[in-house]
Amino acid sequence: MNPQCARCGKVVYPTEKVNCLDKYWHKGCFHCEVCKMALNMNNYKGYEKKPYCNAHYPKQSFTTVADTPENLRLKQQSELQSQVKYKRDFEESKGRGFSIVTDTPELQRLKRTQEQISNVKYHEDFEKTKGRGFTPVVDDPVTERVRKSTQVVSDAAYKGVQPHVVEMDRRPGIIVAPVLPGAYQQSHSQGYGYMHQTSVSSMRSMQPPAHLRTYRAMYDYSAQDEDEVSFRDGDYIVNVQPIDDGWMYGTVQRTGRTGMLPANYIEFVN
C-alpha cells in the first residue's frame, strides 16, 4: 500500500516519492516551511522533522542568566563546599607520603621493564660476589624469572661475538675451538694455541641454538623506551628470544640494533 504525503495528505506513488525525516513526501511538496523553495536530499536541513532551506533554518538561541543575589549565593555556597571537601581529602592523605597516580597501561609496561632491569642487575651483582660465601636460596618463581632474564642477556652477548668466530672458521678444515677465559689465559701463558682438524659434523655442532629464531615484522613500530628497538613492516628480526608474555628480545637485521620488541608485531618465518 502506498503511503500518504506528509504535507498534502495525498497518496505518494513510487515515481515521485521522497523518503526523508521519517516521512514520505511528493517531490513538489518537499519544500522549505518558510519560503517554499523546492528542496532535495542535498540541500535541505531538518528541524523538528520539517524541511528548511539554509537561509531559514531555525537558529538555536541561548538565554543569558543574570547574576541574581540567589545565584550568587548558590555559587558561593558551592565554592565553600568544594574547599571543605578539598581540605578533608588533604587531611586524610597527609602523612601517607605518596600521591595517587592512575595505573595506566603505559605505567604498567614501564613498571615491568624496570623490574626486569632490576632483576638482571641484581643477578649480575650476585654473580660477581659468588664464591665469597653464600646462603642457600629456595628456587621460587622470582628466582626463575631472574635466571631467564640473565640467560637472554648472556645469549645476546654471545651473539655479539659469534660473527668473529665464523670468520675465523672459514679456513678449510681448521677451526679454533671455543675455550673459557681462564683456559685461554693459561694456554696463552704457555705459549701455544689450541687448534685441531675437524669434520663437517663438527662444524654443524657450532651452529646457533635452535631457540634463536628469525621473525618478520608485520607492522611498523617506534621504540617507546631506551631498551626497545624500532623496525618497519617487512624487516627481519634475528636471534629472537621470548622474555615474558607479550615481549621478545632480538636484533633488527636491517639496522643491527638489539633490544626488546612487542611479540604481536612480528611473525615466525623459520
UniProtKB/Swiss-Prot annotation:
It comes from Mus musculus (Mouse). Nebulin repeats lie at residues 61-95, 97-131, 133-159. This is LIM zinc-binding domain-containing Nebulette. Residues 210-270 form the SH3 domain. Pfam families: LIM, Nebulin, SH3_9. One of its GO terms (cellular component) is cytoplasm. The modification Phosphothreonine is found at T135. SMART domains: LIM, NEBU, SH3. Binds to actin and plays an important role in the assembly of the Z-disk. Isoform 2 might play a role in the assembly of focal adhesion. Residues 3-63 form the LIM zinc-binding domain. The keyword Metal-binding applies. The modification Omega-N-methylarginine is found at R96, R132. Keywords: Actin-binding, Cytoplasm, LIM domain, Metal-binding, Methylation, Phosphoprotein, Repeat, SH3 domain, Zinc. PANTHER family: LASP (PTHR46218), LIM AND SH3 DOMAIN PROTEIN LASP (PTHR46218:SF4).
